[in-house]
Amino acid sequence: MANLKEIRDRIVSVKNTRKITEAMRLVAAAKVRRAQDQVLKSRPFADKLARVLENIQSRVQFEAVDSPLLSKREVKSISLVCITADRGLCGGYNTNIIKKVEIRYAELVKQGFQPNLILVGKKAIGFFQNRKDRYVIKSTFKELEQVPTVKDSEGITNEILAEFLSENSDRVEIIYTKFITLVSCAPVVQTLLPLDPQGIAEENDEIFRLTTKDSKLLVEKSNIEKSDSEKLPSDIVFEQSPDQLLDSLLPLYLQNQVLRALQESAASELACRMTAMNNASDNAKELASTLNLTYNKARQAAITQEILEVVGGSVV
């Protein structure tokens, strides 16, 4: 039987670890709420921008507009934007997104391309920089805000635009983690450039809200549908030409897409960390209970042994 002091020390250590994991779970929950608030705050701008672009689209055919962000040219080179976290302790979040990038990269190589990587997050940077002989890294971004802001998306968007407009890349794809629920998220691949006119003004969108029910954290998701009141009046007169308007608005739309990917990734990371820390807390509780049982058995055995020795000594 193990030494009583060793078991007692182990119990104290496990209980202290549980306090840490529980605190990390609560911190992650609070940050999910902040991420939710950030999404809601950015929603009005994104909605109005989509309405303006829809209004322009209703008047002119985007295909007839000479905008470099809409031009589809022969694809000779491709850039992949990969979004991971700066930190670990979030379950399989980073591993899953890196695997998705590896799979997509291998697919493009088989098609005869040599993709460039634009890496966001220390985990992706560390992983792919250790494999420079297999991957081409164009640029890196790290230490972004845990609740992404427009400033965070600006630098990434500028890098993407520079790659596409200079024709170093003919297509830009972004690989990020889509937030589904607190216990479910999935890596997805989305084409950023060239922009698709049909996908610029979506009919429906989703937002998430973190709520509580019976002392448990839950996520409510709802569709945001366009209403007639949100549509811009049809008699609005634009002073600039469609080309000028789109040259100004499309980069904003692209930046909003990047920001959305960052926000979804951040929410997914925090949700995965909540789940991981919750599981760690449950495991610590179970381990502490098992150790307590072992300690009590060891203590009982020691007391029994002492009694037997005393009884044996008195008989002698």
Curated annotation (Swiss-Prot):
Q: Name one GO cellular component term.
A: proton-transporting ATP synthase complex
Localization, per the record, is:
Cellular thylakoid membrane
One matching Pfam family is ATP-synt
Record-level Gene Ontology MF annotations = ATP binding; proton-transporting ATP synthase activity, rotational mechanism
Q: Which Gene3D superfamilies match?
A: 3.40.1380.10, ATP synthase, gamma subunit, helix hairpin domain
Membrane topology note? Peripheral membrane protein
Provide this UniProt record's keywords sorted from A to Z.
ATP synthesis, CF(1), Hydrogen ion transport, Ion transport, Membrane, Thylakoid, Transport
Task: Give the quaternary structure.
Answer: F-type ATPases have 2 components, CF(1) - the catalytic core - and CF(0) - the membrane proton channel. CF(1) has five subunits: alpha(3), beta(3), gamma(1), delta(1), epsilon(1). CF(0) has three main subunits: a, b and c.
Family recorded in the similarity comment:
Belongs to the ATPase gamma chain family.
What is the annotated role of this protein in its UniProt record? Answer: Produces ATP from ADP in the presence of a proton gradient across the membrane. The gamma chain is believed to be important in regulating ATPase activity and the flow of protons through the CF(0) complex.
State the protein's name. ATP synthase gamma chain
User: Whose protein is this, by species?
Assistant: Prochlorococcus marinus (strain MIT 9215)
What gene codes for this chain?
atpG
